[in-house]
Amino acid sequence: MIFPCLFQSMLNLYAEALSTFSLLFEEAKSSSEIEPDAMMLATASLEGHPSVRTVLLKKFDARGFVFYSHIDSPKGRDLQANPQAALLFLWRSLREAGVQVRIEGRVQQVLAEEADAYFASRPRQSQIGAWASMQSCPLGSPEEFQARLAEVKATFEGRDVPRPEGWVGFRVAPRVLEFWYGARFRLHERWRYEVDAAGYWRKFLLYP
């Protein structure tokens, strides 16, 4: 039996984890970190072949952590076949010896309206680039890409650039958040938040 006060405490653990991330993220943005919103994104194909790359965090809230990409890119194909992912933030300049945040969870596409709104906020040249790029496909030469950019620019001259149909947002809904605080002599501090099969959040202090 889960008592109401304990259940509320478990719910509050997720809010606590998000608040901790938010505070660290703001600290990173105020630090010497060049791209504090950069995060490693690990995915795996349906066959279990892993891959990892750097993407940028565009939004986070209680629903999860959002990034954008082409749905036909390798990461997009992985996530359509196997909608699970892991994220990693590493802020080396924070605290005594850096801070690392790991996040694991299930992935869903954001609503089209949300993707439209974010795409509309991007610089025009970035919007044009999203149309011109066939992400991760072989490219004959840099000049070929420049020609595609010029073609897209001419196509949308004098009007708004709409979001390409295949340019979508992905949201990672956390089931695990782990905070690693680096210290000298490898005497690190690790806190792990995870949700169990019944949907209750737990918090653990881990050996470094």
Swiss-Prot record:
InterPro entries reported for this sequence: Pyridox_Oxase (IPR000659), Pyridox_Oxase_CS (IPR019740), Pyridox_Oxase_N (IPR011576), Pyridoxamine_oxidase_dimer_C (IPR019576), Split_barrel_FMN-bd (IPR012349)
Family, as annotated: Belongs to the pyridoxamine 5'-phosphate oxidase family.
Record-listed substrate binding positions: 58, 118, 122, 126, 186-188
The protein's annotated pathway: Cofactor metabolism; pyridoxal 5'-phosphate salvage; pyridoxal 5'-phosphate from pyridoxamine 5'-phosphate: step 1/1; Cofactor metabolism; pyridoxal 5'-phosphate salvage; pyridoxal 5'-phosphate from pyridoxine 5'-phosphate: step 1/1
General function of this protein: Catalyzes the oxidation of either pyridoxine 5'-phosphate (PNP) or pyridoxamine 5'-phosphate (PMP) into pyridoxal 5'-phosphate (PLP).
NCBIfam families (UniProt xref): pdxH, PRK05679.1
Classification via Gene3D superfamilies: Electron Transport, Fmn-binding Protein, Chain A (2.30.110.10)
Record-level Gene Ontology MF annotations: FMN binding; pyridoxamine phosphate oxidase activity
Name under which the protein is recorded: Pyridoxine/pyridoxamine 5'-phosphate oxidase
Cofactor: FMN
